[in-house]
Amino acid sequence: MQITDKKNKIVNLKWIAIGNLPIMTKRGHFILNGAARVIVNQILRSPGIYYQQKIYENYEEKWSQKPKDSYIRYYADLICMRGTWLRIEMDKEKNIWAQMKKLPKIPMFWFLLAMGFSEKKILSFDSGYLIGNLTTTPLEKKEIKKIGSKNSQLNDKTKNSNMKDKKKNKHNSNKTIIRKNSLEIDKNKKSLLSRYSYPYLKTPPEAWEHIAQLFFPQNTPGIAASFSKVPLPSGSAKKARASKNNVENNSKEKKNNFALIGRKWFYNRFMNPRAYDLGKQGRWSFNRKLSLNIKNTTLTGLDVLYATDYLIKVEKGVYKTDDIDHLKNRRVRTAGELISIQIGIGLVRLEKSIREKNFINNKAFNSAIREFFGTSPLSQFMDQINPLAELTHKRRLTSMGPGGVNRDNATLAIRGIHPSHYGRICPIETPEGKNTGLVNSMTTYARINDYGILESPYYKVYKGLVLKNTGIFFLSAEQEEKIKLAAADIFVSQISCLPKALIPVRISEDFTRIPRSQVQFIGISSIQMISIATSLIPFLEHDDANRALMGSNMQRQAVPLIRPERPIVGTGLEARAVSDSGHVLISKKSGFVTHVSANKIVIFSCSMD
């Protein structure tokens, strides 16, 4: 901790214990209050930008089978690691809006202005989509009515002055309000600016004011609100005119303050690194998708502007929508990342308590850690019925939990099997009931890389020759889309050559046959598509899929015997499953066993390491 004395300009550094963390054992679980607990891996949508479409159907009557008409709505979800999710959507009139949860939607033109762009920069893109939704009711008529109801003496004067200003300049009669009466929408025209005059365009401070008016309507400053606090003038017109000038001055100050409120809200929502963070994976996804080169992990104006332009091109058919269920768009949160997120929450609580009380107390930090390990749905009591149950529990992937899917609202698309699951997520082992498809298991050879992406191992193939000596290549689901993969059960000769006949391969999601010279990679094992529990089922290829699912789940419920025996029929993976679970003693060196007793096992080894 750094303690700074501003008067004497002295900086002192001291070590302070801020809390306690449980230590992970060598077997991969935690001991909390004497009980073993496992942090389950969580698989979520990866931070980034995703374009999707939704079809809306209008029925003439409730009992009619065919819809009267239908339309497609395109939208883009801007997903971050920490902060507010933003959605850029296009309605059926092809107007673009920015929307957040539990908040009114904002016209995209206002949103881009608030991000700091000029009118020329925004209108350099396809402006018909951006300014078409600026047709809202003008506010000045309502204000005139309110003023007239408050004061009858000023009613005629304010009406006449407003009418004169309208005739002089339709666009600039009230500069704090965008004038939309002069804008007419022609849906058949791609560009509105070529034929119709566009309204008076706002500067960023006024855009912040409009955004604040949307989110805080009860605090909206205006002439009517200011007039309600001023006593009604009784007497000559001079007093009335003087009071009106005071009201206008007060309203200008309030509008400036209100623009500042909108600006602060906008900064804290999207541009504050402590409140909004895309993460490395999210920033990489934005840069790759939108062809940008930005290092900042917060949301920038260029991100929103180019995302809007990309959405317009998706609607025109230039680009395709994204498959959100593809594993390239999902990542795994391991135990370390989940605990680090909770540590961040604990540090924020600790900072708040230090600022309020001016005293360091580690209760806030410890309570956050205790809350995660004790009450989080991702912290579970470890299944220790047999070694396989423990090993499977630690290799489990769940889509539920904080920030995940709700089991009651999960659709079949989320629960289903995707082609990108091959070699990464087992298609067989999943619970029965409400959690079907939401809780899965990693395959036998799958691994999680530093970015949380699931990878599967393959051998390189060069001109029909399998290069096993060059090592194993781990490929992600996105890398697999661009290469030609052969299955691992294809016959390979003793000199590692593929057969001369056409070889069945998978290219992205399509299956075809190609010559062996065009094959790029081949699987390393025929069991790399199934999990460890499923690989222990003998003759799995002759088993029904439903029975295999029940068998892989019921193996975890088997009670160990007092005198264990070898299985009559096995698959050869039993020893590896038991050794990896940590339930047996494993020698660190190879050698000959010379002595075995209840107290010790002696191994004679020639190695000197």
Residues covered by each model-derived region:
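Flexible, glycine/threonine-enriched loop-and-boundary segments that flank and lead into catalytic domains
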Residues: 399-427, 570-588
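Generic structural motif
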Residues: 367, 371, 437, 583-595
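Carboxylate/His-rich catalytic cores and anion/metal-binding grooves
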Residues: 589-607
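N-terminal non-catalytic structural scaffold regions of very large proteins
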Residues: 1-398, 404, 443-562, 598
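Short, acidic, Ser/Thr-enriched surface-loop or helix-capping motifs
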Residues: 31, 430, 588
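Edge strands and adjacent loops of beta-rich recognition modules
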Residues: 558-569, 573
